[in-house]
Curated annotation (Swiss-Prot):
Enzymatic class: hydrolase
Domain of life of the organism encoding this protein: Bacteria
Protein species of origin: Chromobacterium violaceum (strain ATCC 12472 / DSM 30191 / JCM 1249 / CCUG 213 / NBRC 12614 / NCIMB 9131 / NCTC 9757 / MK)
Name of this chain's protein: dCTP deaminase
Primary gene name: dcd
UniProt EC number: 3.5.4.13
Pfam families given in the database record: DCD
Pathway(s) the chain acts in: Pyrimidine metabolism; dUMP biosynthesis; dUMP from dCTP (dUTP route): step 1/2
Role, per record: Catalyzes the deamination of dCTP to dUTP.
GO biological process, one term: nucleobase-containing small molecule interconversion
SUPFAM superfamilies from the UniProt entry: dUTPase-like (SSF51283)
Gene Ontology MF annotations: dCTP deaminase activity; nucleotide binding
Family note: Belongs to the dCTP deaminase family.
Amino acid sequence: MSIKSDKWIRRMADQHGMIEPFEANQVKMAADGQKLISYGTSSYGYDIRCADEFKVFTNINSTIVDPKNFDPNSFVEVSGKGYCIIPPNSFALARTVEYFRIPRSVLTVCLGKSTYARCGIIVNVTPFEPEWEGYVTLEFSNTTPLPAKIYANEGVAQVLFFESDEECDVSYKDRAGKYQGQVGVTLPRP
């Protein structure tokens, strides 16, 4: 299994729609000259952005967080501000701007950007499995005792693409994975 380069990422995006919308280079500056947290193609990965749609966790109902019986009322929706404030020691969910179509022979690993990590904000994303497609649900944990800010439409994490020497017998699509084709911020599904 080998990691794929910027050339491969560009080719797969252009010829197979692997990432839409796609940015062929690193974007570090907005059109108005303001600095951005970078996104787009890097040497051996793709820096993804989060959309301006967030679900911020609150414990107003004093519930237990149970992945088999998750209470959607534990979240407050935030959108249209261009950013999200995560309360201290809490978390928020968001989705990517980019829609992904992962080839059958590819598995991705996603890692948070150092800009956020150095501020105590951890980005968690599970692997994109072979033949999975959809918008990615992102989880941001604020590990600090202070409120933390996440910027929409700027880089939040980097996706690394690994291609296997042979295709898998059963892909995510074949087994009808429960998050196949997700379009919004998707809560846990039992």
